[in-house]
């Protein structure tokens, strides 16, 4: 069995060091990273080992679909539920043992996230990934092309009430990400 992991270059070395600790318990082998390029194919953000395109297009489509990307500036800042990873099948609450499972389970079964991923727009300076806009954490952002007003779109983690106080316009997500973030009781 083989798995391909796409990770930002600035996180690759730390990820390799971390995952190698678990290699002692399995027949895992890490291979050297290969260059991979972000592309948009049929309106879907994906990756290619051959085609190199404008990364801005990939970022804009990714943000519109609620697909965030983690970089060194944002690693370790967010919990999986805050990024809606459970709505994408990225967290399995019934699976056996994995690193961080007790924290994930505690949040899922005993509490609900207080802040979670939203797609927003605003006119103003483009915030950087990992930056705070008052009580709102920026995951990713991109300047809107062909916009004379200087607006941007961003994925942010925030409490819904905090979004209104900053004046951000909340935009929609695809239907898969419009489900309640908390566990149904």
Predicted feature descriptions by range:
Residues 1-68:
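Acidic, low-complexity central loop/insert segments
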Residues 101-102:
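Structural motif
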Residues 61, 67-69, 73, 83-90, ...:
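Glycine-rich, small/acidic residue-mixed loop/short-helix segments
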């Amino acid at each position: 069995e083989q798995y391909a992991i796409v990770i930002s270059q600035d996180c690759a070395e730390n990820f390799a060091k971390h995952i190698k600790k678990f290699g002692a318990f399995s027949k895992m082998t890490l291979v050297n990273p290969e260059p991979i390029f972000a592309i948009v194919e049929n309106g879907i953000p994906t990756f290619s080992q051959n085609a190199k395109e404008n990364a801005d297009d990939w970022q804009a489509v990714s943000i519109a679909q609620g697909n965030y990307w983690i970089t060194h500036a944002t690693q370790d800042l967010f919990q999986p539920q805050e990024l809606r990873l459970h709505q994408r099948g990225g967290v399995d609450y019934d699976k056996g043992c994995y690193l961080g499972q007790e924290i994930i389970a505690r949040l899922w079964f005993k509490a609900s996230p207080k802040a979670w991923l939203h797609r927003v727009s605003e006119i103003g300076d483009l915030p950087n990934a990992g930056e705070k806009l008052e009580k709102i954490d920026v995951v990713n952002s991109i300047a809107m092309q062909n916009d004379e007003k200087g607006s941007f779109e961003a994925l942010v983690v925030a409490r819904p009430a905090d979004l209104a106080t900053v004046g951000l316009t909340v935009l929609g997500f695809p239907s898969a990400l419009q489900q309640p973030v908390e566990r149904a009781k």
